[in-house]
Amino acid sequence: VHWTAEEKQLITGLWGKVNVADCGAEALARLLIVYPWTQRFFASFGNLSSPTAISGNPMVRAHGKKVLTSFGDAVKNLDNIKNTFSQLSELHCDKLHVDPENFRLLGDILIIVLAAHFTKDFTPDCQAAWQKLVRVVAHALARKYH
């Protein structure tokens, strides 16, 4: 994947403003609420019975932070995303059996969360760069499935 200097700047510039705990928790909660079938991968998280329960669930918050923290690894390694996510791809494929489509859904939700949090900064050019990034990350995570 080739990144232009402008794309790299748009991604890293916005990432520097992201509150990983809050945005991660919101993104994962939205995934579980908007796409309820994804909840089956989180049965051990306890009460996911309503949007309020999901949003207030400490395990959802913690895992959302973990997910977005690892997304930060992509931002730090834009030129080597495939290798950055090779172990996570293996885990999600071989052990957790997560449908790779869920990575794309989470990426789309992350775009929505970023747009909501950073209305001024999230220009169309910024969105295009982030859309490319979430697509590349989703593809890297789905790699072990092929």
Curated annotation (Swiss-Prot):
Lineage: Eukaryota, Metazoa, Chordata, Craniata, Vertebrata
Species: Chloephaga melanoptera (Andean goose)
Function: Involved in oxygen transport from the lung to the various peripheral tissues.
Residues involved in heme b binding: H63, H92
Globin domain location: 2-146
UniProt xrefs under Pfam families: Globin
Membrane-crossing segments per the record: none
Biological process according to GO: hydrogen peroxide catabolic process
Protein name according to UniProt: Hemoglobin subunit beta
